Amino acid sequence: MMFLPTDYCCRLSDQEYMELVFENGQILAKGQRSNVSLHNQRTKSIMDLYEAEYNEDFMKSIIHGGGGAITNLGDTQVVPQSHVAAAHETNMLESNKHVDDSETLKASSSKRMMVDYHNRKKIKFIPPDEQSVVADRSFKLGFDTSSVGFTEDSEGSMYLSSSLDDESDDARPQVPARTRKALVKRKRNAEAYNSPERNQRNDINKKMRTLQNLLPNSHKDDNESMLDEAINYMTNLQLQVQMMTMGNRFVTPSMMMPLGPNYSQMGLAMGVGMQMGEQQFLPAHVLGAGLPGINDSADMLRFLNHPGLMPMQNSAPFIPTENCSPQSVPPSCAAFPNQIPNPNSLSNLDGATLHKKSRKTNR
């Protein structure tokens, strides 16, 4: 049986007694008189009893507030308190006979209120266990270390943190101390792993700068374009070397002129039967047969016009004379054919000198 607090108990006179009954899920208080039959039995809910007690106190305050009497305009008449209470109880009995749905709702709500009140009494304080205390302590320690002002980064240096960082708009969540140590350790491992890769990238950049300095007229910034230009330049150099070796095969030793590149060019042109006044190169179909990557005259012309190649100088046309053969021409005669003396001019000079000598002897 659930006992009600004394605050909710109504005040009964000496001729009445009250009985608590649990009916239809509700706690009801039945007040009965000893000299009243069962037909006059009163059944009230807790809310009704509370309202009755409140109304009774209110009426008492009105009665006793004016000196214990109610004054009328005509004559003064004192109303005993027992008569007022009896009249009020009569009205309550008549009103309880017409119980509607609203009173039932009030009773159910009062029941829930009482049950909640007793449940709050039964709630016991359970102290936290050791694991929760340790977790809470570590979490608070992380907050305390982060708000001290000094924070250790991955390099081992210390920097002063300001309170403005915590009060910024995008406030970052605080990381506990254990998690921060794990992150710092992981970052150091990543830096140690990336140091060989960084050194390798630095070496590659140095070599690419050296290659850019070797290439003529190279102003490329990206590595891919610079490598393409280096490949083209090396291919043209290889073709030039192959052309020079093929040219030396076609020239015979008897037709080679000593002392100077102009003689080898002249001998090369003479050995293949070309004229001296024309361009002193082998035909495209002859050179292209021994050079890879050159299949037609257009490729040959593009190769000869490459800016990285040294152009071959054209020598002056060679005019053979009667007394000067290719095998017995001195170097001065071959290098400067315009300075070769003419036989007619030599005979005229000899005659002039002989005439002068004869005049001197005659004197």
Swiss-Prot record:
GO biological process, one term: response to salt
An annotated Gene Ontology molecular function: DNA-binding transcription factor activity
One Pfam short name: HLH
Segments of skewed composition (Basic residues): 178-188, 354-363
Tissues where the protein occurs: Mainly expressed in fruits and flowers and, to a lower extent, in leaves, stems, seedlings and roots.
Alphabetically ordered keywords of this record: DNA-binding, Nucleus, Transcription, Transcription regulation
Boundaries of every bHLH domain copy: 188-237
UniProt feature, compositional bias: Polar residues: 340-350
Region Disordered, annotated ranges: 154-204, 340-363
A GO cellular-component term linked to this record: nucleus
Subcellular location: Nucleus
Induction section of the entry: Up-regulated by abscisic acid (ABA) and salt (NaCl).
SUPFAM superfamilies referenced in this protein's UniProt entry, alphabetically: HLH, helix-loop-helix DNA-binding domain
Region forming the signal peptide: none
Record has Transcription as a keyword: yes
Complex and partners: Homodimer. Interacts with APRR1/TOC1. Binds to RGL2 and RGA. Associates to PTAC12/HMR/PAP5 which acts as a transcriptional coactivator.
Cited PANTHER family: TRANSCRIPTION FACTOR PIF3
Function: Transcription factor.
Protein name in the entry: Transcription factor PIF6
